[in-house]
């Protein structure tokens, strides 16, 4: 098993991509640490995957991030974060206070994560950011979301140089069939799934297990750093 003896921290690990990555990492022999904002969901997720440890705090809180990593009893090997939700609004309706909070959550929090985590990560370990493909698919209401998805790869590339030999990569996910997607789409979820099955080149909907498989590959292939990897089923090439 490729991750035996290694520790993987999943920020946003109580559901969706984070939880599925925890399952995949455990299947490869890793110890997993789950971080999230809901103690109840974390407890259920920890029981599901057999997590070594959990921590409940808001990953957008710099002090909480630094306390968490400082308090870990041992060095770690990999960190994956899926924390932070996109802010959707056309320019005419943009709430700049909310937009600023979203930038804090999407950009500054990721820098705080790198600064807090890097000293605790063993050489050739990884920081993995899960972002999106919005910068390549402009649409009304996606101004801020696109800007954040464009900024993340540039930030990660710079961090890969500064933090070497710790590796830093980005997973750019398109639509992924997660509980968050279900909450956002509500009654429109089935229609969206059907549309994607008809239009995506792969002929199916991308699931969290697809993202998790790539995450584990990026943890174990030590030649990969400073890059962005798409998991969107070819969505960026079609108007799906």
Residue spans for each PLM region:
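Conserved glycine-rich cofactor-binding loop
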Residues: 14-15
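Rossmann-fold cofactor-recognition segment
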Residues: 48-63
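Substrate-binding pocket helix/loop in short-chain dehydrogenase/reductase
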Residues: 90-91, 98-103, 192, 196
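Catalytic loop of short-chain dehydrogenase/reductase
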Residues: 102-103, 112, 124-164, 175-176
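Conserved Rossmann-fold SDR core element
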Residues: 153, 162-177, 224-231
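A glycine/serine/threonine-rich, flexible loop-to-helix segment
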Residues: 176-199, 238-240
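C-terminal substrate-recognition "lid" of short-chain dehydrogenase/reductases
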Residues: 204-231, 236
